[in-house]
Regions:
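Active-site neighborhoods and metal-handling regions in enzymes and metal-associated proteins
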Residues: 1-126
């Protein structure tokens, strides 16, 4: 959740997907170090195998995959950090869609509940 929220707070015009991925890797690595899964940031690739973002458009994975191209207002990208921990037999991936605005971004999927307690409450009351 922290990586997902950090990307939403960080994404803005002028940034690149590579820069967003570097931010994500740092946040995920800090969490994995706290959990004792890794000893240093360079080991995060053991649990984080993909990039945090790609362009969205007509296709789910839109045509611009150049990670060094700068983001521009009006672009829509994914925010999807994921950790895959084989020894715990789990994978965790939180995904949002972000609209790049003039001064940051808007989370297009903001209304989706993601807090564990809110999800449990929703499931019990359906």
């Amino acid at each position: 959740m922290k990586a997902n929220r950090t990307i939403a707070k960080t994404a803005k015009p002028g940034m690149t997907l590579r820069e967003l991925n570097d931010v994500c890797k740092k946040v995920l690595a800090e969490g994995c170090i706290r959990l004792g899964l890794i000893e240093n940031e360079e080991e995060i690739g053991t649990y984080y195998m993909h990039s945090v973002s790609h362009h969205l458009g007509i296709d789910v994975h839109d045509v611009n995959t150049l990670e060094n191209d700068k983001l521009l207002p009006g672009m829509v990208i994914s925010d999807e950090p994921g950790l895959y921990i084989d020894e715990w037999e789990i994978g965790i991936r939180i995904e949002d869609d972000l609209l790049i605005t003039e001064d940051g971004c808007e989370v297009l999927s903001e209304q989706i509940i993601r807090d564990p307690d809110e999800i449990e409450g929703f499931m019990q009351n359906r």
